[in-house]
Amino acid sequence: MTAILERRESESLWGRFCNWITSTENRLYIGWFGVLMIPTLLTATSVFIIAFIAAPPVDIDGIREPVSGSLLYGNNIISGAIIPTSAAIGLHFYPIWEAASVDEWLYNGGPYELIVLHFLLGVACYMGREWELSFRLGMRPWIAVAYSAPVAAATAVFLIYPIGQGSFSDGMPLGISGTFNFMIVFQAEHNILMHPFHMLGVAGVFGGSLFSAMHGSLVTSSLIRETTENESANEGYRFGQEEETYNIVAAHGYFGRLIFQYASFNNSRSLHFFLAAWPVVGIWFTALGISTMAFNLNGFNFNQSVVDSQGRVINTWADIINRANLGMEVMHERNAHNFPLDLAAIDAPSING
Protein backbone atom coordinates (compact mmCIF):
# COMPACT_ATOMS: atom_id res chain seq x y z
CA MET A 1 0.00 0.00 0.00
CA THR A 2 2.85 2.36 0.84
CA ALA A 3 4.54 1.69 -2.50
CA ILE A 4 1.32 2.48 -4.39
CA LEU A 5 0.88 5.77 -2.56
CA GLU A 6 4.49 6.77 -3.27
CA ARG A 7 4.05 6.00 -6.96
CA ARG A 8 0.87 8.07 -7.13
CA GLU A 9 2.62 10.92 -5.33
CA SER A 10 5.57 10.81 -7.76
CA GLU A 11 3.20 10.75 -10.73
CA SER A 12 1.40 13.70 -9.22
CA LEU A 13 4.67 15.64 -8.85
CA TRP A 14 5.62 14.83 -12.45
CA GLY A 15 2.19 15.87 -13.65
CA ARG A 16 2.42 19.17 -11.79
CA PHE A 17 5.87 19.74 -13.25
CA CYS A 18 4.59 19.05 -16.78
CA ASN A 19 1.65 21.41 -16.29
CA TRP A 20 3.94 24.15 -14.97
CA ILE A 21 6.46 23.74 -17.81
CA THR A 22 3.78 23.92 -20.51
CA SER A 23 1.54 26.54 -18.89
CA THR A 24 0.91 29.68 -20.92
CA GLU A 25 -0.11 31.50 -17.72
CA ASN A 26 3.48 31.84 -16.49
CA ARG A 27 5.05 35.29 -16.71
CA LEU A 28 7.71 33.76 -18.98
CA TYR A 29 6.81 30.66 -20.95
CA ILE A 30 9.29 27.82 -20.38
CA GLY A 31 8.13 24.90 -22.51
CA TRP A 32 9.97 21.66 -23.15
CA PHE A 33 12.45 23.41 -25.41
CA GLY A 34 13.07 25.87 -22.59
CA VAL A 35 14.15 23.03 -20.30
CA LEU A 36 17.19 22.59 -22.56
CA MET A 37 17.50 26.24 -23.64
CA ILE A 38 17.92 27.70 -20.15
CA PRO A 39 20.98 25.66 -19.00
CA THR A 40 22.72 25.79 -22.39
CA LEU A 41 22.37 29.57 -22.80
CA LEU A 42 23.31 30.19 -19.16
CA THR A 43 26.41 28.04 -19.61
CA ALA A 44 27.41 29.78 -22.85
CA THR A 45 26.84 33.24 -21.36
CA SER A 46 28.70 32.52 -18.11
CA VAL A 47 31.74 31.00 -19.82
CA PHE A 48 31.79 33.84 -22.38
CA ILE A 49 31.86 36.52 -19.67
CA ILE A 50 34.56 34.76 -17.65
CA ALA A 51 36.71 33.99 -20.70
CA PHE A 52 36.33 37.48 -22.16
CA ILE A 53 37.60 38.93 -18.91
CA ALA A 54 40.30 36.48 -17.84
CA ALA A 55 41.13 33.74 -20.37
CA PRO A 56 44.87 33.36 -21.12
CA PRO A 57 46.21 33.60 -24.71
CA VAL A 58 45.28 30.80 -27.13
CA ASP A 59 47.55 29.05 -29.64
CA ILE A 60 44.99 29.48 -32.43
CA ASP A 61 47.26 28.47 -35.34
CA GLY A 62 48.85 25.55 -33.51
CA ILE A 63 52.37 26.94 -34.01
CA ARG A 64 53.14 27.91 -30.40
CA GLU A 65 52.33 31.58 -30.95
CA PRO A 66 49.43 32.34 -28.58
CA VAL A 67 47.01 35.17 -29.37
CA SER A 68 45.64 37.25 -26.48
CA GLY A 69 41.91 37.90 -26.38
CA SER A 70 40.81 38.76 -22.83
CA LEU A 71 40.62 42.06 -20.98
CA LEU A 72 43.12 41.06 -18.28
CA TYR A 73 45.69 40.25 -20.97
CA GLY A 74 45.79 43.72 -22.48
CA ASN A 75 42.67 43.98 -24.63
CA ASN A 76 39.75 46.39 -24.54
CA ILE A 77 36.09 45.94 -25.48
CA ILE A 78 36.86 46.52 -29.18
CA SER A 79 39.94 44.33 -29.53
CA GLY A 80 38.91 41.61 -27.08
CA ALA A 81 37.46 38.27 -28.18
CA ILE A 82 37.08 34.63 -27.32
CA ILE A 83 39.86 33.14 -29.46
CA PRO A 84 38.81 30.06 -31.50
CA THR A 85 40.00 26.60 -30.54
CA SER A 86 43.54 25.76 -31.71
CA ALA A 87 44.24 24.28 -35.13
CA ALA A 88 46.08 21.55 -33.22
CA ILE A 89 42.68 20.36 -31.96
CA GLY A 90 41.03 20.59 -35.38
CA LEU A 91 37.45 19.32 -35.27
CA HIS A 92 37.95 17.05 -32.28
CA PHE A 93 35.41 17.26 -29.48
CA TYR A 94 37.44 18.97 -26.75
CA PRO A 95 35.70 19.10 -23.36
CA ILE A 96 37.69 19.90 -20.22
CA TRP A 97 38.14 16.24 -19.30
CA GLU A 98 39.89 15.52 -22.61
CA ALA A 99 42.78 17.84 -21.71
CA ALA A 100 45.64 16.90 -19.41
CA SER A 101 44.97 20.00 -17.32
CA VAL A 102 42.81 23.10 -17.25
CA ASP A 103 45.84 25.15 -18.31
CA GLU A 104 46.24 23.00 -21.41
CA TRP A 105 42.51 23.29 -22.14
CA LEU A 106 42.69 27.07 -21.92
CA TYR A 107 45.89 27.25 -24.01
CA ASN A 108 44.20 25.26 -26.79
CA GLY A 109 41.08 27.44 -26.76
CA GLY A 110 38.67 25.01 -25.14
CA PRO A 111 36.26 27.77 -24.00
CA TYR A 112 35.47 28.70 -27.62
CA GLU A 113 34.19 25.23 -28.48
CA LEU A 114 32.25 25.04 -25.21
CA ILE A 115 30.59 28.43 -25.78
CA VAL A 116 29.77 27.86 -29.45
CA LEU A 117 28.25 24.40 -29.04
CA HIS A 118 26.12 25.44 -26.05
CA PHE A 119 25.11 28.67 -27.79
CA LEU A 120 23.99 26.93 -30.99
CA LEU A 121 22.00 24.37 -29.04
CA GLY A 122 20.47 27.17 -26.96
CA VAL A 123 19.34 29.35 -29.86
CA ALA A 124 17.95 26.30 -31.68
CA CYS A 125 15.91 25.53 -28.55
CA TYR A 126 14.81 29.18 -28.41
CA MET A 127 13.48 28.77 -31.95
CA GLY A 128 11.69 25.59 -30.90
CA ARG A 129 10.28 27.40 -27.86
CA GLU A 130 8.84 30.08 -30.15
CA TRP A 131 7.08 27.39 -32.17
CA GLU A 132 5.91 25.63 -28.99
CA LEU A 133 4.35 28.78 -27.51
CA SER A 134 2.72 29.66 -30.84
CA PHE A 135 1.25 26.15 -31.02
CA ARG A 136 -0.18 26.31 -27.49
CA LEU A 137 -1.73 29.73 -28.15
CA GLY A 138 -3.24 28.62 -31.45
CA MET A 139 -1.04 30.96 -33.48
CA ARG A 140 0.58 30.32 -36.84
CA PRO A 141 4.25 29.19 -36.77
CA TRP A 142 5.87 32.03 -38.75
CA ILE A 143 7.69 33.62 -35.78
CA ALA A 144 9.91 30.56 -35.43
CA VAL A 145 10.34 30.40 -39.21
CA ALA A 146 11.58 34.01 -39.25
CA TYR A 147 13.97 33.33 -36.37
CA SER A 148 15.43 30.42 -38.32
CA ALA A 149 17.32 32.95 -40.46
CA PRO A 150 19.70 34.22 -37.74
CA VAL A 151 19.94 30.67 -36.35
CA ALA A 152 21.04 29.45 -39.79
CA ALA A 153 23.55 32.31 -40.08
CA ALA A 154 25.06 31.57 -36.66
CA THR A 155 25.23 27.85 -37.43
CA ALA A 156 26.97 28.60 -40.73
CA VAL A 157 29.81 30.70 -39.27
CA PHE A 158 30.27 28.79 -36.00
CA LEU A 159 29.78 25.17 -37.11
CA ILE A 160 29.38 24.53 -40.85
CA TYR A 161 32.35 26.69 -41.89
CA PRO A 162 34.77 25.08 -39.39
CA ILE A 163 33.58 21.63 -40.50
CA GLY A 164 34.21 22.49 -44.15
CA GLN A 165 37.63 23.97 -43.41
CA GLY A 166 38.65 21.16 -41.09
CA SER A 167 39.18 23.05 -37.84
CA PHE A 168 37.34 25.13 -35.25
CA SER A 169 40.27 27.56 -35.51
CA ASP A 170 38.63 28.80 -38.73
CA GLY A 171 35.40 29.70 -36.92
CA MET A 172 34.42 33.30 -36.26
CA PRO A 173 36.03 34.73 -33.10
CA LEU A 174 33.59 35.96 -30.46
CA GLY A 175 34.47 39.64 -30.45
CA ILE A 176 34.23 42.85 -32.46
CA SER A 177 37.69 42.99 -34.03
CA GLY A 178 37.70 39.20 -34.33
CA THR A 179 34.51 39.37 -36.38
CA PHE A 180 36.11 41.93 -38.70
CA ASN A 181 39.19 39.72 -39.04
CA PHE A 182 36.94 36.78 -39.94
CA MET A 183 35.21 38.85 -42.62
CA ILE A 184 38.47 40.05 -44.17
CA VAL A 185 40.02 36.58 -44.22
CA PHE A 186 36.80 35.11 -45.60
CA GLN A 187 36.92 37.59 -48.47
CA ALA A 188 40.58 36.82 -49.12
CA GLU A 189 40.07 33.06 -49.23
CA HIS A 190 36.59 32.76 -50.76
CA ASN A 191 35.88 36.03 -52.61
CA ILE A 192 32.51 36.26 -50.86
CA LEU A 193 31.75 39.70 -52.32
CA MET A 194 31.48 38.07 -55.75
CA HIS A 195 29.16 35.27 -54.55
CA PRO A 196 25.51 35.69 -55.67
CA PHE A 197 24.14 34.34 -52.37
CA HIS A 198 26.01 37.05 -50.47
CA MET A 199 24.57 39.62 -52.87
CA LEU A 200 21.07 38.32 -52.11
CA GLY A 201 21.84 38.60 -48.40
CA VAL A 202 22.93 42.23 -48.80
CA ALA A 203 19.72 42.93 -50.72
CA GLY A 204 17.76 41.25 -47.92
CA VAL A 205 19.36 43.22 -45.08
CA PHE A 206 19.45 46.64 -46.74
CA GLY A 207 16.13 46.08 -48.50
CA GLY A 208 14.54 44.98 -45.24
CA SER A 209 15.85 48.13 -43.53
CA LEU A 210 14.47 50.29 -46.34
CA PHE A 211 11.06 48.60 -46.33
CA SER A 212 10.86 48.76 -42.54
CA ALA A 213 11.64 52.48 -42.56
CA MET A 214 9.15 53.10 -45.39
CA HIS A 215 6.39 51.18 -43.61
CA GLY A 216 7.00 52.80 -40.24
CA SER A 217 7.11 56.30 -41.69
CA LEU A 218 3.97 55.74 -43.79
CA VAL A 219 2.01 54.45 -40.80
CA THR A 220 3.28 57.24 -38.54
CA SER A 221 2.36 59.82 -41.17
CA SER A 222 -1.19 58.51 -41.65
CA LEU A 223 -2.29 58.03 -38.03
CA ILE A 224 -5.94 58.72 -37.31
CA ARG A 225 -5.95 61.79 -35.08
CA GLU A 226 -7.59 61.06 -31.72
CA THR A 227 -5.93 63.83 -29.70
CA THR A 228 -5.62 67.59 -29.73
CA GLU A 229 -2.71 69.48 -31.25
CA ASN A 230 -1.22 69.90 -27.77
CA GLU A 231 -1.06 66.17 -27.07
CA SER A 232 1.13 63.46 -28.47
CA ALA A 233 -0.48 61.49 -31.27
CA ASN A 234 0.62 58.34 -29.43
CA GLU A 235 -1.86 59.12 -26.65
CA GLY A 236 -4.69 58.43 -29.10
CA TYR A 237 -4.02 54.70 -29.10
CA ARG A 238 -5.33 52.26 -26.51
CA PHE A 239 -3.88 48.77 -26.29
CA GLY A 240 -6.33 46.23 -27.67
CA GLN A 241 -8.60 48.73 -29.41
CA GLU A 242 -10.65 47.33 -32.29
CA GLU A 243 -10.43 50.41 -34.51
CA GLU A 244 -7.62 50.90 -37.02
CA THR A 245 -4.93 53.18 -35.68
CA TYR A 246 -3.91 54.47 -39.11
CA ASN A 247 -5.56 55.07 -42.48
CA ILE A 248 -4.21 52.39 -44.82
CA VAL A 249 -6.17 53.90 -47.72
CA ALA A 250 -4.37 57.23 -47.26
CA ALA A 251 -0.99 55.49 -46.99
CA HIS A 252 -1.76 53.40 -50.09
CA GLY A 253 -2.80 56.47 -52.05
CA TYR A 254 0.28 58.45 -51.02
CA PHE A 255 2.75 55.72 -51.91
CA GLY A 256 0.94 54.84 -55.13
CA ARG A 257 1.26 58.44 -56.28
CA LEU A 258 4.85 58.71 -55.07
CA ILE A 259 6.06 55.68 -57.08
CA PHE A 260 3.27 54.11 -59.14
CA GLN A 261 -0.04 52.49 -58.30
CA TYR A 262 1.00 48.86 -58.12
CA ALA A 263 4.10 49.56 -56.01
CA SER A 264 1.80 49.96 -53.01
CA PHE A 265 0.13 47.11 -51.13
CA ASN A 266 -3.63 47.28 -50.68
CA ASN A 267 -3.68 44.27 -48.35
CA SER A 268 -2.24 44.75 -44.88
CA ARG A 269 -1.65 41.01 -44.39
CA SER A 270 0.32 40.51 -47.59
CA LEU A 271 2.28 43.68 -46.80
CA HIS A 272 3.43 42.39 -43.43
CA PHE A 273 4.25 38.97 -44.85
CA PHE A 274 6.46 40.70 -47.42
CA LEU A 275 8.17 42.77 -44.70
CA ALA A 276 9.01 39.55 -42.83
CA ALA A 277 9.89 37.36 -45.80
CA TRP A 278 12.27 39.72 -47.62
CA PRO A 279 15.08 39.90 -45.00
CA VAL A 280 14.51 36.31 -43.85
CA VAL A 281 14.97 34.86 -47.34
CA GLY A 282 18.02 37.10 -47.87
CA ILE A 283 19.69 35.88 -44.68
CA TRP A 284 18.80 32.28 -45.56
CA PHE A 285 20.70 32.72 -48.81
CA THR A 286 23.69 34.26 -47.00
CA ALA A 287 23.83 31.32 -44.59
CA LEU A 288 23.61 28.95 -47.55
CA GLY A 289 26.42 30.87 -49.26
CA ILE A 290 28.67 30.60 -46.19
CA SER A 291 27.88 26.88 -46.01
CA THR A 292 28.84 26.30 -49.66
CA MET A 293 32.00 28.41 -49.40
CA ALA A 294 32.92 26.36 -46.33
CA PHE A 295 33.65 23.58 -48.81
CA ASN A 296 35.49 26.00 -51.14
CA LEU A 297 32.70 26.56 -53.67
CA ASN A 298 33.75 30.19 -53.84
CA GLY A 299 32.56 33.42 -55.42
CA PHE A 300 32.86 34.22 -59.11
CA ASN A 301 36.35 34.75 -60.53
CA PHE A 302 36.42 37.37 -63.28
CA ASN A 303 40.16 38.04 -62.98
CA GLN A 304 41.81 39.22 -66.22
CA SER A 305 38.63 38.45 -68.13
CA VAL A 306 38.85 41.54 -70.39
CA VAL A 307 41.65 41.76 -72.96
CA ASP A 308 42.29 43.98 -75.97
CA SER A 309 42.92 42.84 -79.55
CA GLN A 310 46.62 42.21 -78.76
CA GLY A 311 45.78 40.06 -75.76
CA ARG A 312 46.80 42.67 -73.19
CA VAL A 313 44.76 42.62 -70.00
CA ILE A 314 42.41 45.53 -69.40
CA ASN A 315 41.97 45.69 -65.65
CA THR A 316 38.44 45.72 -64.22
CA TRP A 317 37.23 46.12 -60.66
CA ALA A 318 37.38 42.31 -60.39
CA ASP A 319 41.16 42.50 -60.86
CA ILE A 320 41.43 45.18 -58.16
CA ILE A 321 39.45 42.96 -55.78
CA ASN A 322 41.73 40.03 -56.61
CA ARG A 323 44.80 42.12 -55.81
CA ALA A 324 43.26 43.12 -52.48
CA ASN A 325 42.43 39.47 -51.76
CA LEU A 326 46.07 38.46 -52.30
CA GLY A 327 47.27 41.21 -49.99
CA MET A 328 44.84 40.24 -47.25
CA GLU A 329 45.76 36.57 -47.52
CA VAL A 330 49.48 37.39 -47.27
CA MET A 331 48.82 39.18 -43.98
CA HIS A 332 46.65 36.37 -42.61
CA GLU A 333 48.49 33.86 -40.40
CA ARG A 334 51.72 35.46 -41.61
CA ASN A 335 53.88 33.18 -39.46
CA ALA A 336 52.04 30.00 -40.42
CA HIS A 337 52.69 30.37 -44.15
CA ASN A 338 54.63 32.89 -46.19
CA PHE A 339 52.54 33.10 -49.33
CA PRO A 340 48.87 32.99 -50.27
CA LEU A 341 47.70 29.56 -51.36
CA ASP A 342 47.20 30.93 -54.90
CA LEU A 343 50.91 31.75 -55.17
CA ALA A 344 52.24 28.79 -53.21
CA ALA A 345 50.40 26.30 -55.42
CA ILE A 346 53.00 26.64 -58.20
CA ASP A 347 55.63 23.87 -58.14
CA ALA A 348 58.99 25.06 -56.90
CA PRO A 349 61.96 24.60 -59.27
CA SER A 350 64.31 21.73 -58.53
CA ILE A 351 67.55 22.69 -56.74
CA ASN A 352 69.26 19.32 -57.10
CA GLY A 353 70.93 20.21 -60.37
UniProtKB/Swiss-Prot annotation:
Tyr-161 forms a radical intermediate that is referred to as redox-active TyrZ, YZ or Y-Z. C-terminally processed by CTPA; processing is essential to allow assembly of the oxygen-evolving complex and thus photosynthetic growth. The chain crosses the membrane at residues 29-46, 118-133, 142-156, 197-218, 274-288. Chlorophyll a PD1 binds at residue 198. A quinone binds at residues 215, 264-265. The record marks 190 as: Stabilizes free radical intermediate. The modification Phosphothreonine is found at residue 2. The D1/D2 heterodimer binds P680, chlorophylls that are the primary electron donor of PSII, and subsequent electron acceptors. It shares a non-heme iron and each subunit binds pheophytin, quinone, additional chlorophylls, carotenoids and lipids. D1 provides most of the ligands for the Mn4-Ca-O5 cluster of the oxygen-evolving complex (OEC). There is also a Cl(-1) ion associated with D1 and D2, which is required for oxygen evolution. The PSII complex binds additional chlorophylls, carotenoids and specific lipids. It is found in: Plastid, Chloroplast thylakoid membrane. Its main location: plastid. The record marks 344-345 as: Cleavage. Residues 345-353 form a propeptide. Keywords: Acetylation, Calcium, Chlorophyll, Chloroplast, Chromophore, Electron transport, Herbicide resistance, Iron, Magnesium, Manganese, Membrane, Metal-binding, Oxidoreductase, Phosphoprotein, Photosynthesis, Photosystem II, Plastid, Thylakoid, Transmembrane, Transmembrane helix, Transport. Pfam families: Photo_RC (PF00124). InterPro entries: D1/D2, Photo_II_D1/D2_sf, Photo_RC_L/M, Photo_RC_L/M_CS, PSII_D1. Photosystem II (PSII) is a light-driven water:plastoquinone oxidoreductase that uses light energy to abstract electrons from H(2)O, generating O(2) and a proton gradient subsequently used for ATP formation. It consists of a core antenna complex that captures photons, and an electron transfer chain that converts photonic excitation into a charge separation. The D1/D2 (PsbA/PsbD) reaction center heterodimer binds P680, the primary electron donor of PSII as well as several subsequent electron acceptors. PSII is composed of 1 copy each of membrane proteins PsbA, PsbB, PsbC, PsbD, PsbE, PsbF, PsbH, PsbI, PsbJ, PsbK, PsbL, PsbM, PsbT, PsbX, PsbY, PsbZ, Psb30/Ycf12, at least 3 peripheral proteins of the oxygen-evolving complex and a large number of cofactors. It forms dimeric complexes. Belongs to the reaction center PufL/M/PsbA/D family. This is Photosystem II protein D1. It comes from Glycine max (Soybean).
